[in-house]
């Protein structure tokens, strides 16, 4: 996967502003939810090819937007991400 240059994220924040990028992130999350619903519906009825692509495309959009949300306060984001990671690590390793 291509790493996103932090400078590009900064340019986007300057160009569009924190509020607009946050609203865009909300929209992308909504599109991901819709794609996930369509994926499960198609999975049930056996027509998955296009819905898998749609699901992944929306997941990538959300991923890029979350990188921009991280740009708002990188230290706080990373601190919380570390706590969340430890939580899922415990769940994964629990017997």
Outline where the language-model segments fall:
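Flexible "arm" and connector segments at domain edges
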Residues: 1-95
